[in-house]
Amino acid sequence: MAKSGKKYIQALSKVNKLKSYNIDDAISLLKEIKFVKFDETIDVSVNLNLKKNHTVRETLVLPHQFMKEKRILVFAKGEKAEEAREFGAAYVGDDDLINKIKDGFSDFDVVVATPDMMKDVGKLGPILGKRGLMPNPKTQTITNDLKGTIASLKKGRTEFRANKNGVINFSVGKSSMDSKKIRENYDEFIKELLKRRPSDLKGTFVDSVYVSSTMGPSVKIDFV
């Protein structure tokens, strides 16, 4: 939805575009200029200085959860399938589940697979890849440790990644949350992001950081 209209312009007028705010002041400002009734998401947008060969991607569990519990789909057989069911996966199967997805089933948020299933799961590449849900070792979603993986996903483990333009968009809270909790989620995200600086990168890694709410204007962060 385009950000426009009288209320948006009024909110925008309260943001000093020539100023970089510290994160605490920025969060307070976003709460102050909120003009919609629903509980907005607080988002962080980071512009990175990356080369074409650089990949920045990581998973983390934020200290304060705010999103609804993810619907976990697991590809597994035998004892591993039973393990996935026992620890709370929403959907568990092998060939039957693969065929169901081919037929259009999409009522899930994250996909996990045991290594032995990947040969068959790979056939779903065009479908799962389009949604960014293809199991991947980098996101710890190809694993035999279904108990640990499902537990961490239920706790809110989520992923961030830089797009082709070197931008990461990541949510750190809801406008209704305590400001301190939003700040702590932001700090955890930034801490994990800085660990992913490419080893061969010269110069600045983070060019700029902005925070915004779903419908509100962005606020530049004084990032050092």
Swiss-Prot record:
Keyword Isomerase among record annotations: no
Q: What is this protein called?
A: Large ribosomal subunit protein uL1
Q: Which Gene3D superfamilies match?
A: 3.30.190.20, 3.40.50.790
Q: Which family does it belong to?
A: Belongs to the universal ribosomal protein uL1 family.
What does the record give as the function of this protein?
Binds directly to 23S rRNA. The L1 stalk is quite mobile in the ribosome, and is involved in E site tRNA release. Protein L1 is also a translational repressor protein, it controls the translation of the L11 operon by binding to its mRNA.
Subunit composition? Part of the 50S ribosomal subunit.
GO: which molecular function terms? rRNA binding; structural constituent of ribosome; tRNA binding
| PROSITE patterns associated with the record | RIBOSOMAL_L1
Biological process per Gene Ontology, one example term: regulation of translation
Going by the UniProt record, its keywords in alphabetical order are: Repressor, Ribonucleoprotein, Ribosomal protein, RNA-binding, rRNA-binding, Translation regulation, tRNA-binding
Q: Which residues form a coiled coil?
A: none
Keyword flag Ribosomal protein: yes
Give any Pfam family that matches. Ribosomal_L1
User: Which cellular component terms (GO) are annotated to the entry?
Assistant: large ribosomal subunit
**SUPFAM superfamilies linked:** Ribosomal protein L1 (SSF56808)
